[in-house]
Every structure is written in structure tokens, then in C-alpha cells.
Curated annotation (Swiss-Prot):
It comes from Mus musculus (Mouse). Keywords: Cytoplasmic vesicle, Glycoprotein, Membrane, Transmembrane, Transmembrane helix. The lineage of its organism: Eukaryota, Metazoa, Chordata, Craniata, Vertebrata. Residues 685-701 have a biased composition (Basic and acidic residues). Disulfide bonds: none annotated. This is DC-STAMP domain-containing protein 2. PANTHER family: DC-STAMP DOMAIN-CONTAINING PROTEIN 2, DENDRITIC CELL-SPECIFIC TRANSMEMBRANE PROTEIN. It is a multi-pass membrane protein. Signal peptide: none annotated. The chain crosses the membrane at residues 15-35, 40-60, 82-102, 215-235, 310-330, 404-424, 488-508. It is found in: Cytoplasmic vesicle, Secretory vesicle, Acrosome membrane. It comes from the Eukaryota. The keyword Transmembrane applies. Residues 673-701 are annotated as: Disordered. Expressed in testis.
Length: 701
């Protein structure tokens, strides 16, 4: 019967685990598909793989079941909160930030389109501005062509005249050459008659002198004949000189005037016609303005490639989060099973049962906890947080607030950019065309080449005035990208989940211990025993520490601090030093001031003349015994009775406490004190401590 019930429980447990595993895998797949926006095929593969692991693991493996159950409260841990914030910020980067970048991209494209449109219209205006000059240039070219035809005809006519003149010149040149060479031919044929004649007589004279060398004077008789005969021969020489005189006459009278006349005739037909046209427009550009803008966008995209890849990884934060949380759950299970100190700060029901058993058996107990212990050890169902949890709670709230401010700033930036661009789109929609307000017409009258040129120029300027310039065109209309309202809802949900995890994470994280305790009860009992023994040993050490603190403060109580000395020495400073509570009382064990706990919560020693004042916790740790006056009677410590002979107050307090607590020990204590001090202690001196004690009681009341 018992075996059948255990088998039924195992079957139910496996069935529930299998169902829970399938449900968790299905929820994860829907979150990936609808929340993260992944591809359906990838979500299907991931969901099927995760469902196989979770369903089979939770159905048939105790370890997997514990790890998955630990995964749920582990989602409220510090690391999971951090990953949730990272995932939420990833949604912000993929939503508002990406939309802001998209709006800036569309704005830059619209600006580039407008700039290219303006450039094209500028080129069109330049073409229109060139039309008058081109028309004038065509007329000038036509005039030049006609002038060239006339010039060709004049050139032919002039060439005919030049040919005729050249023919006449060649005839005259032949005559000229004949006259020029006729003298040379005459001289070459006839020679120089006078020279030849004188040469003959000179040769005869020389020959005569050779023949009649004895009578050379006879040879001089030929001289008169020489002069006569050679003078007649010089008349023949005049005939050869006539051509040279005729050549000079022809050069000066005929050749020079004829050449001047021909040059003057040529200059009459010479003319220059120059047409100069200067029109230079430099618009050298290898790429259009839109191509330049696209190149700039491509360069910026290359620079931001690493950042875009990092942003793309934000879409896989959910699988990374689940994997990290599962590893954290495995680590928690491992440390729970192997470390007694790990997360062992809870006063559970089993701890209280152990406390009750020890109390009934008369053994030392640890409850109630001290104020210091209560800050570190709490009950699992308590609404109060431990000191460590409070510190982490404050830090997480501050961190979440910082992330919320950054998220709101990015969301407002996205909406602000869209609002500005949409406002610009609303006011710049339509088409604006700039037209000439006044059309001026110019009429040119007259005929001829100049009139035609001026008339063409005027008509070209009429064409320019009729042109229109598009200032705003629908082709460059700005279309900003609207913010995704659904994305805002998802982001708000994620940050709301982060806030919920931060607010209740410390409470939900306590369920991890409960889950492990339900699956490992023997291990939980070991941890509770360790915690109880640690508190008990710590409590014993605390008692000795409190006793030493009481003795130290009792010895220092008669001394005054610097503020008290100043108040006594300088009375006018007392109003200023009054707020510092110069006469403030405090617990002699832990030093807690009376204004924190209230004087009604403090316990004063009932021994007359004793200044002992304790908080309830310290008084309970001292077993409701004053360590100032009852120290020699305590079983927990032994005082060193090394007293000065002038110290009479402490022995009297000890004797009074012994008389009140154990009268039979008074005589024994008196003997020990007399041996230590070397003097006799009489009962007369007790009146002074009693009066001092009464005054002390009156002051405390």
C-alpha cells in the first residue's frame, strides 16, 4: 500500500514536471517571437530543443527539477536584475535609438535631394543664360562666313591684278637685265681702249730700251704719239658707259614709282575682321551631390559597423539571460549542499523548534536575538530586510533610477526628433515655383547684320524671363519615421518588470532556500544546527566582551572629556555646548545612548552607590547581574584585586552587592579585600556609598 502511494506520487510529480517544462518552453518561444521579433523558424528550433530538455529533465530528473525551480526565484537576484536592465536597454537601442538614426538618415536624404535639385536648376539657368550669347555668336559666324566669301572674291581680283603686274614686271626685268649686262659684254668684247692703247706704248718703250740700251733716251720719243693715239681711243670707251647711265635712269624713274604704286594698291584691299567670344563656365564634378551624400553615409556606416553589430547582439539577450540564470541556479544548489555559511541567515521553523527543545531541556538558548544579531539574521517570512539586503536594495533602486532617466531621455529624443521633422514636413508640403514678376520686352527695328544680332539677343532674353525655378518640389518631401507605440509598451513593461524585481527581489530570493530545504531536508537540518551552534558560541564570546567593556567604561566614568572641561572653565560657553549632551547617560556594555532607546528601556543597578546602567540586551547577556558591583561574585570572570589604598568606593560597592545578593559571602569577600588592601574595612564607611547611591537613584529618576 505504501509502495503504491509512493509510486503514484512519483508519477504525479513526473507528470507535473513534464507539463511545467512544456509550459516554460512555450512561454519562452512566444516571448522570443512576439517580444524580440526573431524569425519563426529560429524560434521553433529553439523552443523544440528547450522543450525537450525541460520536459524530460523535470519529468525524470530530480536535479534538473530543483535547478529549474531555483531558476524562477533566481530571476529576482542581483545578476538577473542587471541582465534585465541590459535587455531593456537593448530594446531601447533597437527601438527609439534606431528610429532616431532612421529619421536623421531620411532628413539627410531629403537635404541631399534638395541640393541636387537646386544644382540641376542652376545648370538649367546657366544654359538659358548662354542662349543670348550663343545666338549672337551664330550671327557673328554668319557675318564672318559672308565676309569670307567677299574676301575670297577680292583676293581673286587682286591676284589677277598681281599676275598682270608681275608679267609686266618680268618684261621690264628682262629689259633691265639686258641693259645691266650690255656694258659688261661691251667691255669684255672691246675691252678698255685707253688702257689697251697705253699698254701697247708701254710695252714698246720697254722693248726699245732693251734694244738700244746705250741710248735709252731715244725711246722717250714715243710719248707724244701715245698721248695722241690713246686720246682718240678713249672716245670709243663712251659707248660702253651708256648702259650704266640708262640703268640708273630706269631704276630711279620707272622701277621705284611702279613698286610704290603696287604697294598702295595692295593696301587698299587689305582689312582685318576679328570676332572674340569669351564664355567660360567651370562645373567640373565627377559625381553628383546625391552620390557624394551616399558615399558619406556609407563611410559613416563603416565607422559604425562595430556598434551596429554590438546592437544586433542585443536581440539575443533573452537566451543569454536564461542561460546565465540557469548557471546561477546550479551554483546556488552547489554552494547550498557544500557550504554551511552560504545564505544561512534565516530563523526558520526548525530553528525555533530546536530553540524550544533546548529551552525545555534547560540548555543555553540564543533567543531573543540582540539588536546587532537582528540586523543580520531574520525570519524568511519577515517584512523587514537584513542590513545586507537593505544596502543592496538601496543600490539597486539608485541604479534603476539612473537607467530610467537614460531611457526617458532617449525616448523623448526619439519623439522630439520625429515631432520636429513632422512639423517641417507639414509646413513644407506642396510645391513652390518662383516666377518672374515683370516681363520686359525689347523690340529692335532696322535691317542689316547688326540689327539681326540685336534682335536675336532680345528674343533670347525673353526666353530667360519665361523660365521658372522650383524652390520646393514634392520629389524631395521629407517622410519621418513614426515612433513605435508597441515598442514603447514593451519597453515600459520591461522596465516595470525591472522595478518589480528590484522592489520584491529580496523577498522572492528567500524562496531559493525553501526550495532546497524541501528537496534536501537532511542538509537543511545540518545548516540549522551549524547556525545555532555559531550563534551560541558567538553569544558566549559576546558575554565576555560585554563584561570587559563594562569594566573599562566603569574605570573611565570618573574622567571628563574636553567639552566638559571647557564648560567648567568657561561658563559663557555652556549655552553653546548644551546641545551636545554633556551629561548624557549611556549603556556601560554597548555604549548605546539613553536618548536612542529611551530611559524607560534602560536598567540601572539596584546596589546603592553603583553607577551601572545597561540596555536590556546587555543586561540579559550579563545574566541580569551588574558587572560593576557584582564582578567578584560572578562565575564568568575573576577580577584582579589590584586596588589602590585610596580607592574606597569599589570595595564598598562590592561588599554592598554581596550583602544584598549573598550575605554568607560578605565575610569571605571582606577578608579578600582586607588582604589585598592591607587595611580594615569597617561598616561605617557604608553610609557614604548608600547616600551616594540614593543621590544617584534620585538623579536617574
Amino acid at each position: 500500500m505504501e509502495e503504491g502511494s509512493s509510486t503514484a506520487r512519483a508519477v504525479v510529480r513526473s507528470t507535473c514536471g513534464f507539463t511545467v517544462g512544456l509550459s516554460l518552453a512555450t512561454a519562452f518561444g512566444l516571448l522570443e517571437l512576439l517580444g524580440e521579433g526573431h524569425s519563426p523558424f529560429g524560434c521553433l528550433v529553439t523552443t523544440v530543443t528547450l522543450a525537450a530538455f525541460l520536459s524530460l529533465g523535470m519529468g525524470f530528473s530530480r536535479q534538473v527539477r530543483v535547478s529549474v525551480l531555483l531558476l524562477l526565484p533566481q530571476a529576482f537576484s542581483k545578476q538577473s536584475r542587471l541582465l534585465l536592465l541590459v535587455a531593456s536597454f537593448g530594446l531601447v537601442l533597437q527601438g527609439p535609438c534606431a528610429n532616431t538614426l532612421q529619421n536623421f538618415t531620411r532628413a539627410s536624404e531629403a537635404v541631399a535631394c534638395g541640393a541636387e535639385l537646386a544644382l540641376n536648376q542652376t545648370a538649367e539657368m546657366l544654359e538659358r543664360a548662354k542662349q543670348p550669347l550663343i545666338s549672337a555668336l551664330s550671327k557673328i559666324k554668319a557675318i564672318a562666313q559672308k565676309a569670307k566669301v567677299v574676301g575670297d572674291r577680292i583676293r581673286k581680283f587682286f591676284r589677277s591684278i598681281i599676275d598682270a603686274v608681275k608679267h609686266i614686271a618680268r618684261c621690264l626685268q628682262n629689259v633691265w637685265y639686258w641693259l645691266l649686262h650690255i656694258g659688261d659684254m661691251c667691255n669684255s668684247e672691246l675691252g678698255n681702249p685707253y688702257s689697251k692703247c697705253t699698254q701697247v706704248f708701254d710695252d714698246a718703250k720697254i722693248h726699245c730700251m732693251k734694244v738700244v740700251s746705250g741710248f735709252p733716251h731715244l725711246c722717250y720719243a714715243l710719248l707724244p704719239y701715245k698721248l695722241l693715239v690713246c686720246g682718240l681711243a678713249s672716245l670709243v670707251q663712251k659707248f660702253c658707259v651708256l648702259p650704266s647711265y640708262l640703268e640708273f635712269f630706269l631704276r630711279t624713274v620707272i622701277r621705284t614709282p611702279v613698286m610704290k604704286l603696287l604697294g598702295k594698291l595692295r593696301r587698299e584691299f587689305e582689312f582685318n575682321m576679328t570676332a572674340t567670344h569669351y564664355f567660360s563656365v567651370d562645373l567640373n564634378s565627377s559625381r553628383s551631390l546625391s552620390q557624394v551624400a551616399l558615399d558619406l553615409q556609407e563611410a559613416v556606416s563603416m565607422k559604425l559597423y562595430t556598434a551596429r553589430e554590438a546592437l544586433s547582439l542585443m536581440g539575443y539577450t533573452m537566451p543569454l539571460l536564461i542561460g546565465f540564470l540557469y548557471i546561477q541556479a546550479l551554483c546556488y544548489r552547489y554552494y547550498y549542499l557544500n557550504s554551511d555559511k552560504f545564505d544561512n541567515v534565516y530563523i526558520t521553523r526548525r530553528f525555533l523548534d530546536m530553540e524550544a527543545v533546548r529551552s525545555l531541556a534547560g540548555m543555553p538558548t540564543v533567543l531573543p536575538l540582540s539588536s546587532h544579531e537582528a540586523k543580520h539574521y531574520i525570519q524568511p517570512d519577515s517584512m523587514f530586510l537584513s542590513q545586507r539586503e537593505q544596502m543592496f536594495y538601496t543600490l539597486e533602486i539608485f541604479n534603476l533610477t539612473r537607467h530610467l532617466l537614460i531611457m526617458l531621455l532617449l525616448v523623448f529624443l526619439d519623439y522630439g526628433v520625429f515631432w520636429l521633422l513632422d512639423l517641417a514636413r507639414y509646413h513644407l508640403q506642396g510645391e513652390i515655383v518662383a516666377r518672374s514678376p515683370v516681363v520686359v520686352s525689347i523690340s529692335v527695328e532696322g535691317s542689316g547684320y547688326s540689327g539681326n544680332i540685336y534682335r536675336d539677343l532680345a528674343s533670347a532674353f525673353d526666353v530667360m524671363q519665361q523660365g521658372n525655378v522650383s524652390v520646393l518640389s514634392p520629389r524631395c518631401t521629407l517622410h519621418p519615421s513614426e515612433p513605435d507605440a508597441k515598442g514603447y509598451i514593451v519597453i515600459g513593461t520591461m522596465y516595470g518588470l525591472c522595478f518589480f524585481v528590484t522592489l520584491f527581489g529580496s523577498y522572492v530570493s528567500r524562496l531559493r532556500r525553501a526550495i532546497c530545504a524541501s528537496y534536501y531536508p537532511s542538509r537543511e537540518q545540518e545548516r540549522i544546527t551549524y547556525l545555532y551552534n555559531m550563534l551560541l558560541s558567538h553569544r558566549t564570546n559576546i558575554t565576555a566582551t560585554v563584561q570587559r567593556a563594562v569594566r573599562r567604561r566603569s574605570a573611565d566614568q570618573g574622567q571628563m572629556n574636553i567639552l566638559q572641561v571647557l564648560a567648567i572653565r568657561l561658563p559663557f560657553l555652556r549655552p553653546l555646548l548644551g546641545p551636545f549632551s554633556l551629561q548624557q547617560s549611556y549603556c556601560m556594555g554597548c555604549g548605546e545612548p539613553e536618548d536612542k532607546g529611551g530611559m524607560e528601556n534602560f536598567v540601572s543597578c539596584s546596589t546603592p552607590g553603583c553607577r551601572g546602567l545597561y540596555c536590556p540586551t546587555c543586561f540579559r547577556l550579563l545574566n541580569n547581574t551588574c558587572s560593576v558591583c557584582s564582578a567578584p561574585l560572578s562565575n564568568q570572570g575573576h577580577l584582579d584585586l589590584e586596588l589602590d589604598s585610596s580607592d574606597e568606593e569599589s570595595p564598598q560597592l562590592w561588599l554592598a552587592a554581596a550583602r544584598r545578593k549573598a550575605p554568607e559571602q560578605e565575610l569571605k569577600l571582606r577578608q579578600q579585600l582586607q588582604e589585598a588592601l592591607g587595611t580594615n574595612l569597617s561598616d561605617k564607611s557604608t553610609s557614604k556609598p548608600e547616600r551616594a547611591g540614593n543621590r544617584n537613584q534620585d538623579r536617574k529618576q
